[in-house]
Regions:
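Catalytic-loop motifs flanking and including active-site residues across diverse enzymes
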Residues: 88, 191, 195, 243
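Conserved small/polar residues in nucleotide/adenosyl-binding loops
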Residues: 241-250
Length: 251
């Protein structure tokens, strides 16, 4: 239960941070400059879906008991929609709807064939974008897995209003090296920083640095796409639902 940064170069501006795994010779994010540029978004309309929530790794789950340890038999995946990523997506969806934002939540299990999960979810996203051209934001909701070489699991935790809450991390990608056909990646990074800034205003310390690396993860499909890691498999359902930390998305 700690703050975890991982590798890469940490770039910061105020309370905002990016953990960049991209060589500075290719691109060095200027957080201040990116924040000055407006995200490519329309005004939210409750009558039409603006946001798509989905899960490439749908069966990712959490530690059910905060016992401080786990065993080889601990099951950190679940087919139950009340214990896997669908539960997180349901709560996020409900709140955004209360904020007057049109949302579609896809509850499809995409990781029955784990190695093909992103290919499966890409087809799902493409279908929704065709059906609902009004969708501008896609959020692939996951939970992270941080395990040290000695098998110790990390559960990044913040203390918000005196209670523990699972920290969240946005993953942003770019067109670099092996990643091709991702021309609008900087729009995503701009949007990601705006989201991180809003969350940090309301719940300081809740967000981990944005992980910026040579990844696509279907984020090339809209200009406002990101992958969101809500806690890790070391966190408990109580820690990610406390304060409904995801509610900051609606604001």
């Amino acid at each position: 239960e700690e703050s975890y940064q991982g590798g890469g170069t940490i770039l910061s501006f105020g309370s905002l941070a990016i953990q960049s795994k991209i060589p500075a010779s290719f691109y060095r994010p200027d957080i201040e400059a990116l924040l000055k540029q407006k995200a490519a978004l329309s005004v939210p309309n409750a009558a039409k879906p603006t946001v798509l929530i989905y899960h490439s790794h749908t069966t990712e789950g959490y530690t059910l008991l905060d016992a401080g340890y786990y065993t080889k038999s601990t099951d950190l995946r679940s087919d139950s929609s009340t214990q896997n990523m669908v539960r997180v997506g349901d709560e996020l969806c409900a709140y955004l709807e209360r904020c007057g934002i049109g949302v579609v939540h896809d509850r499809t299990t995409h990781d029955k064939d784990y190695s093909g999960a992103y290919d499966h979810s890409r087809k799902t996203v493409a279908g929704y974008l065709e059906k609902y051209p009004s969708i501008e934001i896609t959020i692939d909701v996951h939970r992270d897995d941080i395990t040290y070489d000695n098998k110790t699991k990390v559960k990044p935790t913040a203390k918000i209003k005196g209670k523990k809450a699972a920290r969240m991390m946005i993953i942003a990608g770019c067109e670099y090296n092996r990643v091709k056909n991702f021309p609008d990646w900087e729009y995503n990074l701009r949007f990601d920083l705006a989201v991180q800034q809003q969350v940090e205003k309301q719940y300081p310390g809740l967000m981990r640095p944005i992980l910026f690396s040579e990844r696509k993860y279907n984020m090339d499909m809209t200009r406002n796409s990101f992958l969101l890691e809500v806690g890790t498999d070391g966190n408990t359902p109580v820690s990610y639902t406390h304060l409904r930390a995801h509610e900051t998305r609606g604001n």
